[in-house]
Structures are given as structure tokens and as C-alpha cells.
Amino acid sequence: MAKHPLWKDEYWLLLLQLYQKKPMGVKPLYSKGMVDLSLELHIAPEYLHEQMFKLRLVTPRIKRLWEHYGDNPKKLARQIHLLKDMEGYGNATAFYQGVEIKESFEHDWEPLEAEPSLTPVKLIIILDLYFQLTPITMVPETPEIIDLAKLIKTTPDTIVEAMNVYQICDPYLNRNDVVISKLIDACSKIWQRYGNGNPDKLYKLANDLKEYFK
């Protein structure tokens, strides 16, 4: 993977600190710590995840990093505090200047204006559950819907509303009735991205994304 234009060598400190959090080691791709750091730095989790794996390599740079901070978390925390106080830390303004759209991964984690309890990421997870249920079971009382609502911190009714929109998007159902919902735009975009793709890939992605909410 080519070097990200926003990556700085100082960010190794941030990855090392995250790596050392219990349980020590490479964190899941969409763990909360990994995603929050990616949003802070405006660098996709996939890139940071790959960089974190390099902390296990024996290279001169990584060796020095471990020698200086591996057994001294307080020293590491001080250096990170200084890093975050530096001008330009986490500032992507220069990189995004003249660019109207941020990287899609950032938008995927932002609350929907139409329904702040949802994000595109949550809609991806809901879409995966949609494919595991039948229309008659897409009701607030269904245990799987109740469990998912608790996990992603929304309501069963909101999940059912999203599933109703997905039913309209689903060509196999041939629904001709009109659904009035504030989620139509957001759900339609998620369906366009994943609704006609490989369900196994969607299932894996949804399971990976759930890691953030655990």
C-alpha cells in the first residue's frame, strides 16, 4: 500500500499506544480505537491497520520506537500529548482544499441528518440483517432486531423503518407501494453499494463493523 499523503512518522506513536492497550496486539480493523484514530487523522482504518502490523517487524525504525517507549507508557503518553499540541496535527484542510467530498469512510461514520441515531455504517449492518430475515419477521418484536438495536444504539422501530425502505429497493420483492420515510435517500445509497453484491462479503463486512460497537 502506497504511503498515505496525510501520514506522518510521528503517528507511529499513536499506533504504538493503541497497540499496547489491553489486550496487547494488533487491534481489529474496525475496533473503536482504530476507527476513532482514523477519523482523528483523516486516514482510513485500512491504512492504519496495515501500519499497525508493521509494529511487529524488526526494522531499525520500529526497533528504536520499542526501545524508547515500549516499557515506558508514561513517556509515550507525554510525547503524544506534545504531538497533539503541534500545529497542523490532524488537520486535513490543506489536503482537502478544493475537494468537495471527504473520503467516503469518514462520511460512513457520521450521523445521518435525517436520523442522528443512524450512520451509513449502521445501515450497512442493518442491510446484512435484512438479508437474513423474511419480510414477515421485519417487525420490532423480532429478537434479532431487538439485539441489533441494543448493539448499535438505536430503536427497533428505526431498524424496521430502514428495512421497509430496503424492501422497496429489493427487486426480488416487486413492491409497488409507496413508502414515505426520511431514510429513503440514505438507505437507497447503501443498497446501491451493497444490495446487489455478494451477500457473503456483506456478512463479513457487517461482522467486522460490529466490532466498533462492542
Q: Would you name each region that the model predicts?
A:
Residues M1-K214:
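Intrinsically disordered, charged low-complexity linkers and terminal tails
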